């Protein structure tokens, strides 16, 4: 019927070269741009090319874009320039004044959409051509109003689309919100309407401006927005806005914002939001796939139109001729295909002379043309080669008219609506590389490696936006190949493999997935997969990916779903409007009420059935619970009977809390003593370390006389201070000066550098030992702490917590339980008490018989309160003897005391009482135990004291005095009773308890086993305590041994100090002699220089030379005083020593006369004794008292008695020389004795010796000083004796001599160190005795030098330890 004719005027013909434009204008010779033909009633407007378009379709046809005809140099728009409207209502067509009416109102067949890249080509081509502007085409008055409207330009404003079109302001339903008041809701409505204007929602910006006025912080406002925006649309409906204002009010009044909205508020807001959304009408037209130039956001640029190759000759081409105008078809030789456009019986349009209906009008090219056009549908049509126009819309020919004289409407061909998804034909140029792309996308081996590139599948072909049918077929086959299980979709992991085979970049594939996966489902169905593949194909051919999916690529499933939602909303809205306007909502609906009644009846029946089933189940559960409860009651009764029958049942009511608290207090008391003991041990360790260091210094000084260790440190901890170093340097300088005078070289020992090293090594050793002991103490302390913590934890673990106490009160007293359970508990208690009474009655006979046999009748006549004390320890039948509550309480208390005693005994503490005996027996036993312990303690103390005295005697080498020891022993109080007795008592009690338990029933066997376990634990604890006590005793023994060693070291130290003092005295004497010699040499020099002034010089030099007398012999004088204080025989020796004073004064020459010595000596010692408090006592007591005092001292008694013998030996050699220093020595002695009152015996001489050495050093450096320049110590007392001395001695030089002699006499050591007193004095005496023989051998200087040389032998026995005084003082402290 419609055999293969083209449906569109011009089809998809290509452009002709622009060079043909002048010829075409000549062919249309009378047509100017502003003229044209008159509008005819055919609905066609004059075309720019001179042809008038013909209606080739039906109404409701989508807009056809202008197609290009095959005329060279001129684009021939043969389609509609604007979308035609449906039908030809009332339209008339006039062809050469032959009006024909066509009125066909039929549905138009679907027509394919022209691709978007070709929709703007006519305008672009026409703009590029230099042709004059085309006249404005006016619509013809044919009555087609809809068609005229469709030809409006796209720039006209279009109505807003979507369901939220403004309809004169916000519509707020009259629904009351429960979370705000009516006044607040009215205010919020007013505010919302004023802010939102004509819309329905409040935008985010306006919402922010309103909410910021609340002056809340950003975090609160952010939380309020999150809670209020329930739809998550970024906009607020009125209920959401009211909710936001409500939350702001909550925050302003100080309340906290909820983290999640309450369900009631959330439901109200959501319901009101849904009502508002449904109330908005859907006014927008239905979606269409027609391309919109205004809304097009694709950045794709249409491909440039390539100019075709020029034709070889224009003669083969037919010139274009306007259709529908008479007189223009003469130039055509039948080259157009006839196209029926009306009734065949009508006149031919465009061909004069023809009558009778509309004749087919040629609208295309002749069949002999080489470039026919394709016009859309690929149905049955004659094969035609493609035109060289590079446009491949491939529109198929469609039947557009009627044939014959049929009056029926024209039938439409299936050409499709432009833009319809999946029904677009492939372009004329085909789809290049589509086969390669399909094969590449198919599942294949080796795809796991992912080495895919775009090589071989890229190109620059023209691809339409819509998916063509060929593409859809291929993409569906690829989809089915990958969807092996037939799920209808592929997941993301499969899509990664499929799309990755295309070789595109990852960002492009991600964008393609985002565009294809509508709704972000994470999977693609068949249509979405085709969209993704189409986008990949376009990307491979050089097209960029769009920002959003164009309408042509929206899958039908998605579009239909959205349309369905819109349709449902429209229906709901229409129904609600109808019911609201008609008032149907207010009228009751009978059918609805009946339906509800039936539904409720069904629900009630179901509830009744459910309740019956639940009741049956509850009954079954109740019966089961009752059986289980009864079974549990029976088991509890059996267990209670077993508990009552147990022999230790009477002990379960004992209050263990009091016992536990008492043990805690005792443990705390013992723990508190630990720090004090540890601190005492540490102090003892420090004192021992200091003593060891001092002892090493003394031994080192004795072993190395010339070593640097002779420097005694007087600083803290025995550190050597700067003053100590000055003293040592002064002493060394004195030695060097004396060596210079004698002419002998002093050998400096090499030990000076080794002394600090030895001291440091010893100090390190002592410190290491001290640290080891400290670690031991810390270990002991830590172990004791751990032990105490363990005991405390064990006591705590056994204690009752609040929860256990609550449970006890609940299940024993029946508090907080049901009545049935409470009755059961009381029943158990009653049965338990009755069982106890029965067992006590049965077991009373045996204990009563044993008690009658063992105890006296007086014990049986005791009151019930005293009976519990006589009853044996835990037994099953003893509790039944006591009927009253007082007796039972006393019995329980007695049992608790026994257990406490056992625990205390295990801890080593004496138990208060012993079980199984009366009070009188207990008192007698305790008395005997105390007596035995006291006797044992005394014996042990005596033994220890004897051992200590024996050790002391062995270390001292002297047997201890027997009369003194017993006194000390008896004076000492007896030590506390040892813990061994307590432990023995505990073991005895345990043994007796075991014996008593064996005599009772066989049921006690289990109790014995438990007690044995407890006993083993207690024994282990006792062993641990014994070990701890042994360690403590060992530490005590070490402390005692350390004390003994310290005492011995003190004694040795004192002896060494005495020796060093003697040696210092000898050294002082030698120094005095040296100074005297120097003074005499200076005096002789002065006498030689000034012979005339000899008398005056003698008077002046006298007192100057007295200064060395007072300054130098201090050590000797002090030692001499101490010597006098200790032994009785010193008086005869003292006069001999002092007598040389006048002799030396009278004789300036070398030999001092001895007879003059005796006269002045006696008086000064008396003054010295009266001024010294110690010497006063000695003088008052006399010789006998002195002897008795010496005998009372156990340490100095023997040496003091032996002193008289060596005294005369010392006096004889020294008596010749030193006599003049006597008064000065007395003065210094008094000062020294005053000092000794404040300081210890050891500190005095040490400090004095240092000062004397300094004074000697500085005295020898400068000229002699007068008496007025002396220290304060020698000013008061020495003046009187000094005055007496000058008249006796005429020359001043002799005073230094007596100083040399004076120290020679006092070498005997002071009383404190007796052991070394006798031995040291003799060695210095021989050189002193030999001294007088030397002077007469030569002249005066030679005599003095000879005496000094004779004293040189003293250096061999001299110890250069200067630390004696300071060290002794520190030890005494």
Swiss-Prot record:
Q: What is the annotated localization of this protein?
A: Cell membrane; Endosome membrane; Cytoplasm, Cytoskeleton, Actin patch
Q: Which residues form the WH2 domain?
A: 1340-1357
**One Pfam family matching this protein:** EH
Q: Does the keyword Cytoplasm apply?
A: yes
UniProt lists compositionally biased (Polar residues) regions at: 289-298, 1106-1118, 1182-1194
BP term (GO), one: endosomal transport
Q: Which SUPFAM superfamilies match?
A: EF-hand (SSF47473)
Named from the GO MF annotations, one term is: calcium ion binding
Which residues lie in Low complexity bias regions? 1-59, 81-105, 114-141, 299-308, 348-359, 861-880, 1135-1149, 1156-1166, 1277-1287
Biased amino acid composition, Basic and acidic residues: 837-847, 922-954, 982-1001, 1013-1050, 1072-1086
Q: Where is the EF-hand domain?
A: 216-251, 504-539
The record ties this protein, via PANTHER family, to: EH DOMAIN
Which family is annotated? Belongs to the PAN1 family.
What name is this protein filed under? Actin cytoskeleton-regulatory complex protein pan1
Organism whose genome encodes this protein: Sclerotinia sclerotiorum (strain ATCC 18683 / 1980 / Ss-1) (White mold)
- Report which gene this protein is encoded by: pan1
């Amino acid at each position: 019927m419609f055999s293969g004719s083209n449906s569109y005027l011009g089809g998809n013909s290509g452009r002709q070269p622009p060079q043909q434009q002048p010829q075409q204008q000549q062919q249309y010779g009378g047509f100017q741009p502003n003229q044209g033909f008159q509008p005819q009633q055919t609905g066609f407007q004059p075309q720019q090319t001179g042809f008038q378009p013909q209606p080739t379709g039906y109404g409701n046809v989508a807009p056809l874009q202008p197609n290009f005809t095959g005329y060279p140099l001129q684009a021939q728009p043969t389609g509609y320039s604007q979308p035609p409207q449906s039908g030809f209502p009332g339209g008339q067509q006039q062809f050469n004044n032959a009006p024909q009416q066509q009125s066909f109102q039929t549905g138009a067949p679907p027509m394919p959409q022209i691709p978007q890249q070709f929709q703007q080509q006519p305008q672009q081509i026409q703009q590029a051509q230099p042709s004059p502007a085309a006249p404005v085409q006016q619509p013809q008055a044919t009555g087609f109003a809809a068609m005229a409207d469709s030809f409006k330009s796209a720039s006209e404003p279009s109505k807003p689309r979507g369901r939220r079109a403004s309809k004169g302001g916000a519509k707020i339903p009259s629904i009351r919100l429960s979370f705000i008041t009516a006044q607040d809701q009215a205010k919020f409505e007013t505010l919302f309407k004023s802010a939102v204007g004509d819309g329905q929602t409040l935008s985010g910006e306006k919402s922010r401006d309103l909410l910021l006025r609340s002056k809340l912080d950003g975090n609160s406002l952010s939380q309020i927005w999150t809670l209020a925006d329930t739809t998550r649309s970024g906009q607020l409906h009125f209920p959401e806005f009211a909710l936001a204002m409500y939350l702001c009010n909550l925050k302003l009044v100080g309340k906290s914002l909820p983290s999640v909205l309450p369900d009631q508020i959330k439901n109200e807001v959501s319901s009101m939001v849904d009502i508002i959304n449904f109330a908005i009408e859907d006014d927008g037209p239905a979606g269409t796939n027609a391309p919109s130039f205004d809304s097009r956001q694709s950045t794709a640029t249409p491909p440039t139109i390539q100019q075709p190759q020029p034709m070889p000759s224009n003669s083969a081409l037919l010139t274009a001729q306007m259709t529908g105008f008479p007189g223009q078809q003469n130039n055509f030789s039948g080259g157009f295909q006839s196209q029926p456009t009306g009734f065949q019986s009508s006149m031919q349009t465009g061909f004069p002379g023809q009558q009778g209906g509309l004749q087919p009008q040629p609208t295309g090219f002749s069949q002999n043309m080489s470039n026919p056009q394709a016009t859309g549908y690929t149905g049955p049509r004659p094969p035609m080669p493609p035109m060289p126009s590079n446009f491949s819309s491939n529109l198929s020919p469609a039947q557009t008219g009627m044939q014959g004289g049929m009056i029926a409407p024209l039938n439409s061909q299936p050409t499709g609506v432009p833009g319809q998804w999946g029904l677009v034909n492939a372009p004329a140029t085909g789809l290049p590389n589509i086969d390669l792309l399909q094969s590449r996308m198919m599942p294949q081996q080796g795809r796991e490696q992912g080495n895919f590139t775009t090589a071989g599948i890229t190109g620059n072909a023209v691809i339409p936006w819509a998916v063509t049918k060929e593409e859809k077929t291929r993409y569906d086959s690829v989809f089915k190949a990958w969807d092996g299980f037939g799920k209808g979709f592929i997941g993301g992991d499969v899509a990664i493999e499929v799309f990755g085979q295309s070789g595109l970049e990852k960002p492009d594939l991600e964008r393609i997935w985002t565009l294809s996966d509508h709704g972000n489902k994470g999977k693609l169905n068949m249509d979405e997969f085709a969209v993704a593949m189409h986008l990949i194909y376009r990307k491979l051919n050089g097209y960029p990916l769009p920002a959003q999916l164009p309408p042509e690529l929206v899958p039908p499933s998605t579009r239909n779903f959205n349309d369905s939602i819109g349709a449902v909303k429209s229906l709901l809205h229409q129904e609600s409007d109808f019911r609201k306007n008609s008032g149907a909502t207010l009228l009751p609906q009978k059918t609805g009420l009946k339906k509800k009644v039936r539904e409720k009846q069904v629900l009630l029946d179901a509830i009744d059935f459910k309740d019956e089933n639940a009741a049956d189940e509850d009954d079954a559960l109740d019966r089961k619970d009752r059986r289980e409860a009864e079974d549990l009651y029976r088991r509890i009764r059996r267990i209670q009977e077993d508990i009552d029958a147990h022999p230790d049942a009477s002990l379960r009511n004992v209050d263990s809390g009091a016992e536990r608290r008492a043990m805690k207090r005792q443990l705390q008391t013992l723990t508190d003593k630990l720090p004090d003991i540890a601190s005492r041990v540490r102090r003892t360790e420090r004192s021992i370390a200091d003593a060891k260091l001092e002892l090493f210094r003394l031994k080192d000084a004795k072993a190395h006389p010339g070593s640097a260790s002779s420097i005694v440190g007087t600083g803290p901890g025995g550190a050597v201070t700067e003053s100590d170093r000055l003293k040592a340097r002064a002493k060394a300088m004195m030695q060097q000066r004396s060596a210079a005078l004698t002419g002998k070289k002093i050998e400096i020992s090499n030990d000076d550098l080794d002394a600090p090293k030895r001291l440091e090594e010893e100090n390190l050793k002592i410190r290491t030992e001290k640290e080891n002991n400290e670690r031991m103490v810390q270990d002991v302390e830590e172990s004791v702490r751990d032990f105490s913590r363990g005991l405390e934890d064990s006591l705590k673990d056994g204690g009752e917590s609040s929860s256990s106490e609550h449970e006890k009160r609940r299940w024993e007293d029946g508090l907080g339980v049901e009545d049935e359970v409470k009755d059961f508990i009381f029943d158990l208690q009653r049965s338990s008490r009755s069982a106890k009474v029965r067992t006590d009655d049965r077991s009373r006979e045996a204990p009563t018989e044993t008690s009658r046999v063992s105890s006296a009748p007086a014990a049986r006549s005791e009151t019930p309160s005293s009976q519990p004390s006589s009853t044996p320890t835990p037994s099953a039948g003893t509790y039944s003897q006591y009927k009253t509550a007082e007796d039972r309480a006393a019995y329980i208390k007695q049992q608790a005391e026994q257990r406490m005693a056992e625990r205390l005994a295990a801890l080593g503490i004496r138990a208060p009482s012993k079980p199984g005996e009366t009070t009188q027996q207990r008192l007698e036993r305790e008395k005997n135990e105390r007596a035995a312990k006291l006797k044992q303690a005394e014996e042990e103390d005596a033994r220890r004291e004897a051992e200590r005295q024996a050790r002391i005697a062995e270390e001292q080498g002297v047997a201890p005095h027997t009369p003194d020891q017993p006194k000390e022993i008896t004076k000492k109080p007896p030590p506390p009773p040892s813990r061994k007795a307590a432990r023995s008592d505990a073991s005895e009690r345990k043994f007796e308890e075991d014996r008593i338990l064996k005599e009772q029933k066989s049921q006690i066997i289990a109790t014995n086993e438990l007690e044995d376990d407890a006993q083993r634990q207690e024994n282990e604890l006792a062993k641990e305590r014994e070990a701890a006590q042994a360690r403590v005793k060992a530490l005590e023994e070490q402390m005692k041994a350390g004390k003994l060693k310290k005492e011995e070291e003190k004694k040795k130290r004192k002896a060494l100090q005495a020796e060093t003092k003697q040696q210092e005295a000898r050294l002082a004497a030698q120094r005095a002699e040296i100074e005297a010699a120097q003074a005499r040499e200076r005096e002789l020099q002065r006498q030689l220089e000034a012979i005339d002034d000899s008398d005056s010089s003698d008077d002046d030099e006298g007192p100057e030379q007295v200064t060395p007398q007072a300054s130098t012999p201090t050590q000797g004088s002090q030692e001499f005083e101490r010597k006098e204080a200790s032994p009785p025989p010193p008086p005869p020796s003292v006069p001999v020593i002092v007598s040389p004073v006048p002799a030396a004064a009278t004789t300036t020459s070398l030999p001092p006369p001895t007879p003059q010595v005796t006269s002045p000596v006696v008086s000064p010692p008396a003054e010295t004794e009266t001024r010294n408090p110690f010497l006063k006592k000695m003088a008052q007591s006399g010789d006998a008292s002195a002897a008795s005092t010496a005998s009372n001292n156990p340490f100095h008694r023997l040496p003091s008695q032996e002193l008289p013998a060596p005294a005369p030996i010392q006096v004889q050699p020294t008596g010749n020389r030193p006599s003049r220093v006597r008064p000065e020595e007395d003065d210094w002695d008094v000062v020294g004795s005053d000092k000794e009152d404040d300081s210890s015996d050891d500190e005095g001489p040490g400090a004095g010796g240092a000062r004397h050495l300094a004074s000697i050093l500085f005295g020898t450096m400068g000229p002699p000083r007068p008496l007025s320049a002396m220290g304060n110590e020698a000013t008061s007392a020495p003046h009187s004796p000094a005055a007496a001395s000058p008249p006796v001695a005429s020359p001043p030089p002799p005073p230094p001599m007596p100083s040399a002699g004076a120290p020679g006499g006092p070498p005997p050591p002071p009383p404190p160190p007796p052991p070394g007193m006798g031995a040291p004095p003799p060695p210095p005496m021989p050189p002193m005795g030999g001294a007088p023989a030397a002077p007469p051998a030569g002249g005066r200087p030679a005599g003095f030098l000879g005496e000094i040389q004779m004293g040189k032998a003293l250096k061999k026995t001299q110890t250069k330890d200067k630390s004696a005084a300071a060290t002794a003082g520190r030890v005494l402290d």
